[in-house]
Amino acid sequence: MPRPNSHSPGFMRIVLAPTIAVMFLACFAASAQTTIFLDGRVATMQALDKITARISTLSAPVGESRQFGTLEVTVQRCAFHPPEETPENAAFVVIRDLGYDQSVAPAEVFSGWMFSSSPAISALEHPVYDITLLACSAD
């Protein structure tokens, strides 16, 4: 039996068609998986003062503000994976810089999602402070 070459129609049926079908099914199966997040009530964050090299842990309940230096940190939503899933925590955080001058309006320096698994991508980078999400919890 002659061996099909890459230009023959037999090559498409024998080699490429099953390969394409497997790739399609793998993509479909990956998109069918659902990710479960549980609502959290408290976000635990790590705050670094770059001037003094002081590292602090902030516990911020959802809907309440906490202050670190001149920053006001407000967690608007907090969620985490259940224990049987891959560890991941997410929080929607708004951070405002109050500054030292009371006559100047506070400036919003961060508004968005922070993820504990990707601190380099989703952390606040400020000239004086860094803030990253450590965890979200139900209590």
Report each predicted region and the residues it spans:
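Bacterial N-terminal signal peptides
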Residues: A17-C27
